[in-house]
């Protein structure tokens, strides 16, 4: 099965440095690897966001931090939007 391409928004790249500093780099990389294989795989569970964030998905890095992403199904691309803040 062909893997999905991951594309990182500028803020997500900046967030990753914070994630590493907080000791959550391995957890984030594990989630990114899951997204690369299948962005709809469960477990771990994902949340389909609503309201202003409609079209985005979220997975927990830990209790406080979320990995937020968008899935472009037609071209098999996952756009990583954020990895630090809680839905901002």
Identify what each model region corresponds to.
Residues 2-11, 17-18, 22-30, 43, ...:
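Enriched for short, Lys/Arg-rich terminal
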Residues 37-39:
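Blade/loop signatures of beta-propeller domains
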